[in-house]
UniProtKB/Swiss-Prot annotation:
Source organism superkingdom: Eukaryota
A Pfam family it matches: Homeodomain
GO cellular component: nucleus
DNA-binding region(s), chain positions: 215-274
Organism of this sequence: Danio rerio (Zebrafish)
Purpose: Sequence-specific transcription factor which is part of a developmental regulatory system that provides cells with specific positional identities on the anterior-posterior axis.
Taxon lineage: Eukaryota, Metazoa, Chordata, Craniata, Vertebrata
GO molecular function: DNA-binding transcription factor activity, RNA polymerase II-specific; sequence-specific double-stranded DNA binding
Protein encoded by which gene: hoxc12b
Principal location class: nucleus
Keyword set, alphabetical order: Developmental protein, DNA-binding, Homeobox, Nucleus, Transcription, Transcription regulation
Protein name: Homeobox protein Hox-C12b
C-alpha cells in the first residue's frame, strides 16, 4: 500500500468531506523531486478544512470503494448524501426467532442479511414458477382461482394440530354417528335380498347365494289308493269325526290336517255341483 503520505493515491481516497471547489487530480502527480519540492510548500491551515466530520469506520458505505483510486476523482458533499440514502434503504428489519437483524449491526447481521436475500431470490424464482402453473390451471378450469393461489409458501396457512385433535375427538358426536347410521342403512337397504332379486331378474341371471325366504311347501298329490279310501268314507259320512279322521290318517300315511282339508274341499265341490244342476234345471 505504501506510506501513509498525504499525496499517496491510496491515502487520499480516505478523505471524505472536502469542499466542492477543492479538487485533487492524482494523474498529474509524479514521483520526481522537483514536483515533490513544489508540493511541500502547500500547507493546510486547519484540520477542519480537510475533514469537517469524524469518520466512523464501522459505518462504511458499500457503494463506493475506499482503496486504489486510479483516475482523477473529485470529492464533494454529494458523497455523504449518497451514503445517507443507502443507509436509509439498508435500515430494514428482518424478523427472526432470536432478534431483529438490521444492516448496521456488525458482520454477523450483514451475513444474515446476505443469506436471507439469497434465500429470498431463490424462493422468488420458485414462487413465480408455481404461480405461473397455478394461473394456467385456473384458466383451464374456467378462470376460477382458489383462495391461496397468490400466497407465498411462508404465507400459506399451517394446519393446527390442536384443531385436528379436537376434530378427531368430536368425530364421536351424535350427528356424525347419525350420518354414519343413515349411510349404513342405505347400503343395507341396497343390499337387501328383494332388491338383489329384482336386479337379478332384470339382468336375466340368478343369484349365487340361496334366498333366505320362507318358501311354500310343494303340494304333494294323493295316490289312487288314498283317494279311493277317502271317497268311500265321504260317501258314508260327509262330516267325519275326529277319531275317525285319526284312524284314516294313520292307515293312509297322511297327517290329520291333510284329511281334514280334503273333506272340506270335497264338500265345497259337492255344493258347486248341486248349484250347477239346479241352474241347469231352470232352463
Amino acid at each position: 500500500m505504501g506510506e501513509h503520505n498525504l499525496f499517496n493515491p491510496g491515502f487520499v481516497g480516505q478523505l471524505v468531506n472536502i469542499n466542492a471547489r477543492d479538487a485533487f487530480y492524482l494523474s498529474n502527480f509524479r514521483a520526481s523531486g522537483g514536483q515533490l519540492a513544489g508540493l511541500q510548500t502547500l500547507r493546510l491551515s486547519r484540520r477542519d478544512n480537510v475533514c469537517s466530520l469524524p469518520w466512523n469506520p464501522s459505518e462504511a458505505c458499500s457503494g463506493y470503494p475506499q482503496s486504489h483510486i486510479s483516475g482523477p476523482v473529485t470529492l464533494n458533499h454529494t458523497y455523504n448524501q449518497s451514503c445517507d440514502i443507502t443507509r436509509q434503504e439498508d435500515n430494514k428489519c428482518f424478523y427472526s426467532d432470536s432478534a431483529c437483524a438490521t444492516s448496521g449491526g456488525g458482520d454477523n447481521n450483514s451475513t444474515n442479511l446476505i443469506s436471507k436475500e439469497g434465500a429470498l431470490d431463490n424462493s422468488s424464482v420458485s414462487i413465480t414458477a408455481e404461480n405461473g402453473q397455478n394461473n394456467l390451471n385456473g384458466m383451464d378450469n374456467g378462470g376460477s382461482y382458489s383462495k391461496y393461489d397468490c400466497l407465498t409458501p411462508a404465507e400459506q396457512p399451517i394446519p393446527n394440530p390442536r384443531l385436528c385433535r379436537s376434530l378427531e375427538s368430536v368425530s364421536g358426536c351424535s350427528f356424525i354417528n347419525e350420518g354414519a347410521k343413515t349411510s349404513s342403512g342405505i347400503t343395507h337397504s341396497l343390499t337387501s335380498p328383494d332388491i338383489q332379486t329384482s336386479v337379478a331378474a332384470l339382468n336375466g341371471g340368478a343369484l349365487w347365494y340361496p334366498m333366505h325366504r320362507q318358501t311354500r311347501k310343494k303340494r304333494k298329490p294323493y295316490s289312487k289308493l288314498q283317494l279311493n279310501e277317502l271317497e268311500g268314507e265321504f260317501i258314508l259320512n260327509e262330516f267325519i269325526t275326529r277319531q275317525r279322521r285319526r284312524e284314516l290318517s294313520d292307515r293312509l300315511n297322511l297327517t290329520d290336517q291333510q284329511v281334514k282339508i280334503w273333506f272340506q274341499n270335497r264338500r265345497m265341490k259337492k255344493k258347486r255341483l248341486l248349484m250347477r244342476e239346479q241352474a241347469l234345471s231352470y232352463f
